[in-house]
Amino acid sequence: LVVGGSTGAVKVNNAVRAILPELLKKYQVVHLCGKGKTDASLNGIDGYIQFEYISDQMRDLFAISDIVISRAGANAICELLALRKPNILIPLSANASRGDQILNANSFKEHGYSSVMTEEEITPEKLLAAVDDLYKNRQKYIDAMDSSPQSEAVDKIMALIKDCSK
């Protein structure tokens, strides 16, 4: 699953498209490109589907995904941690943001939850190597997320809701 955020991520989209033939030898790719950023020439390629944006079916896409390439916004990283999805985070650059995504990504990398690439270092070759490495080592990332103090947060919240509803 490739998620570039609601507006898409041109550098990520371009890098994914450049390595698509190689990716499709091993993986099926669901690509959320951003509004107006799909590429009609790629429609109908076996193993690849692209959307501008998905909202209601996002949970289903996360459920079927083994790995995720994503921006590093607060909502995205919380979902990735809660769902234990091995991921490559590509934060918005400091020039295009307040820098919060960079802080989020670095924190997740330090905890062993994520692999991180900056926009400036993305090349098709580096992205392909990062995807292959993430997939090969995905259990390491899942184990790190399982050991997170936040790993039981959903269970604790559900227990509180049940207690309050009695």
State each model region's role.
Residues 63-78, 85-86:
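Acidic donor-binding loop of glycosyltransferase active sites
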Residues 70, 86-98:
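Short hydrophobic beta-strand element within catalytic cores of glycosyltransferases
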